[in-house]
């Protein structure tokens, strides 16, 4: 199983060419597994917030989009372990609460994170694929 950052979910939904070859290959490999692709529960909130702010355009209702995503991926709950782990992340890791929950979730679940976020990748705190 691999964990997807929020922007990766958006890019997958839009068939974006922005995904790296390495990310595409990892996603294709993970899709072959029953427990292949996961997102954090906070990703659903991030997507809802982006829609509310008009930063993403929806062709269906927000609730329908979120339900589609929920059906497409394993949604990891925001666990107590992940919340506690956010406080142990070093200063080099992004301060954004969603980034911290996603990164901490990857760490406590032992998952690699697919992300284009340079700040996350540069921190080398979480194993990333890009």
Where are these regions (language model features)?
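Alpha-helix capping/helix-boundary segments
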Residues: 8, 43, 82, 102, ...
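Phosphate/NTP-binding elements of NTP-utilizing enzymes
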Residues: 47
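ABC-type ATPase nucleotide-binding domain
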Residues: 50
